[in-house]
Amino acid sequence: MSILDEFKSFIAKGNVMDMAVGIIIGAAFTGIVSSLVADLINPIIGLITGGIDFSNLFVNLGDGDYVSLAAARDAGAPVFAYGSFITAVINFLIIAWVVFLLVKIVNRVKDAAIHKSAKEAEAQPAGPTQEQLLAEIRDLLKRSPA
């Protein structure tokens, strides 16, 4: 088997394809969560905290006075941008929460399917045991003329 054939076999496996789909959807989902945090959650938090914009919080580590983080970065000033970190933590927590909920839903669906199949298996009448079948065969053999 050539290396190209092995690679084709590897790619054709369900796990790799599922992972690829997950990565693509995850990348798209990151954009949605970033927008959710930047456009919806941060403004609400800013309203509650008196207009604080977390993404613009920073400490200037160099000389000069800058009105915003963007201005400090444009000037090339060294900054400690802890607001960006807070925003990243909020993004992570939201993504982690959504993934947790999705896993919880998938596990519930799996458990329900397993429970349903177990109930269906219990509902079916049990067939004769191996010993009962062997006893029937023995009895039939005894009754048949030799």
Curated annotation (Swiss-Prot):
Database matches in Pfam families: MscL
Quote the InterPro entries the UniProt record gives.
Mechanosensitive_channel_CS, MS_channel, MSC/AndL, MscL_channel
Q: What is its membrane topology?
A: Multi-pass membrane protein
GO MF term (any one): mechanosensitive monoatomic ion channel activity
Superkingdom as given in the UniProt entry: Bacteria
Annotated Gene Ontology cellular components are: plasma membrane
Q: What does this protein do?
A: Channel that opens in response to stretch forces in the membrane lipid bilayer. May participate in the regulation of osmotic pressure changes within the cell.
- Family, per entry: Belongs to the MscL family.
| Subunit field text | Homopentamer.
PANTHER family the UniProt entry points to: LARGE-CONDUCTANCE MECHANOSENSITIVE CHANNEL, MECHANOSENSITIVE CHANNEL MSCL
Recorded protein name is Large-conductance mechanosensitive channel
What is the native source organism of this protein?
Answer: Cereibacter sphaeroides (strain ATCC 17023 / DSM 158 / JCM 6121 / CCUG 31486 / LMG 2827 / NBRC 12203 / NCIMB 8253 / ATH 2.4.1.)
- Native organism taxonomy: Bacteria, Pseudomonadati, Pseudomonadota, Alphaproteobacteria, Rhodobacterales
